[in-house]
Structures are given as C-alpha cells and as structure tokens.
Regions:
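C-terminal peripheral helix-coil segments that are non-catalytic and often amphipathic
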Residues: 1-14, 108-111, 115, 144-160, ...
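Short glycine/proline-centered loop/turn elements that form peptide/ligand docking sites
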Residues: 2-20, 32-36, 45-47, 55, ...
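Helix-turn-helix
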Residues: 25, 29, 33, 37-71, ...
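Short, basic, alpha-helical segments at the C-terminal edge of helix-turn-helix-like DNA-binding modules
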Residues: 78-83
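Hydrophobic alpha-helical connector segments
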Residues: 89-121, 169-176, 204-207
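All-alpha amphipathic helical-bundle segments outside canonical DNA-binding/catalytic cores
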Residues: 100, 137-142, 159-175, 226-227
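Amphipathic alpha-helical segments used for helix-helix packing
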Residues: 101, 115-137, 187-193
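Short acidic/histidine-centered micro-motifs embedded in hydrophobic/aromatic stretches
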Residues: 122-126, 141, 175, 179
Length: 227
C-alpha cells in the first residue's frame, strides 16, 4: 500500500489527523491503559507518552479525545460515577415514597463500585491520600453533586416522618456512603479471609442486606417511647 512514512514512529493502523469511526477502540484503549498505569504508578508519575505507548497509539490521540492527561482521568471517573449522580438527582427531584428510593441509590452506588473494581483504589490513592492530585477536582465535579443532594433527600424523608425525628441527615449520608463503599475497599482482606465475593447472586444478596441494615437503623419507630 502506501510507502513507509519517515515522519512519525508508527502504530500499525495509525495515521496523523482526525481519527476515523473505527478508532473508537483507540479511545477505550487509552482509558483502559491510562487507568492501569494510574493505579500502578500514581497520577504524577505517568506521562501521556507512556499511556499512548501502552495503548499502541500516539500522545496526539490523548489530546484529541480528552484534551490532556487530566481530561482522560476525568472521563474515566465520569463514566463510572455518572449513573450514580443521575440516580441521586432523580431522587432529589421526585417526591418518592421514602425507603425504596433510598435503596435504589444504594443499589446504584454498589453496582457502580462492583462493576469498576479499580474505583476504590483510585479514590484512596488520588483523592483521599494527603498528596492526592485529583482531590479538588473530584470534590467539585462529583462529590459536590451527590453528597448535598443525598443530605437533602434524607432531610426530606425525616421531615415527612419516614426517618427518625432525631436523625442528623449528614450523619445518615456518611453512614449510607460508608455502607456502600467500604465492603469493596476491604475486599483484598475480606475476600480471602471471609470468602466474600460481591458478584452475581451474592452481590444482589449483599445489596439487599446492606439496604435493610441502613433502613432499620434510620427508619421512624412506631412503638411508643421511641423517636
């Protein structure tokens, strides 16, 4: 076919310029290899050149699809978190009937983490760690969109008498989020020690168990002498 190109070290099917429709796989490969390198080495220790080389393409493709390295990682997190954001927003905007809607949020959150097992490690390394490079952006773009909305929903449920009158909705939100995510953070220990495998039918059972645990802890009491 075409004579060898003397300008750029080539990937087998890569040519300079705008990617074609078949190059959607390139975008996914960049996300996949970028995620793996980030988890292995940390955000500050990985270059766009390294990510591109691992994906078998050029740094120009990172700039084309994502703008820069931060944009690539932002897209990676958005793809995982957006269904959860949508679920919380929908719950906030509708009257709902209390507990079943909260269970839907818990289900969305836990399924999101189960489907993206890299997510807890990324959050610990790049958000929770003192030197995490993505903490500010994660708070601004994701946490700030879900946590206040979740608190508002819990406050509404309390005011409508479905949750205990003395319940602090902020504390309840922290408890709900912790119940949903910590089992996956601790999986490297609970997996081999307890045989915990949150997948398939076991994941469904565990989600139901967690939702029941939360519900019974926050629900309004009907017996006299309780609030």
């Amino acid at each position: 076919m075409a004579a060898p190109n003397h300008q750029t070290p080539q990937s087998p099917t890569r040519r300079p310029g705008r990617p074609t429709g078949g190059d959607a796989a390139v975008r996914e490969s960049l996300l996949e290899h970028g995620r793996d390198l980030l988890l292995q080495h940390g955000f500050g220790n990985v270059s766009t050149r390294q990510i591109a080389a691992a994906a078998g393409t050029t740094p120009a493709m990172i700039h084309y699809y994502f703008g820069d390295k931060r944009g690539l990682y932002r897209t990676m997190i958005e793809s995982a978190v957006q269904p959860l954001i949508d679920s919380v927003r929908q719950l906030e905007q509708t009257a709902g009937d209390g507990t079943p809607d909260l269970e839907a949020v818990m289900r969305a959150y836990m399924r999101m983490v189960a489907a993206n097992p890299w997510f807890p490690a990324l959050i610990i390394r790049e958000v929770l760690d003192q030197n995490g490079r993505m903490r500010g952006e994660f708070i601004e773009r994701f946490a700030a969109k879900t946590a206040p909305a979740l608190v508002a929903v819990l406050r509404r449920e309390r005011e409508q008498g479905r949750l205990r009158a003395g319940l602090d909705p902020r504390f309840a939100a922290v408890s709900l989020l912790s119940l949903c995510v910590f089992p996956f953070v601790s999986l490297p220990i609970t997996g081999p020690v307890l045989g915990f495998r949150p997948e398939g039918a076991e994941l469904d059972r565990f989600i139901s168990h967690t939702a029941q645990l939360f519900r019974e802890g926050v629900a309004a009491r009907t017996e006299p002498g309780h609030d």
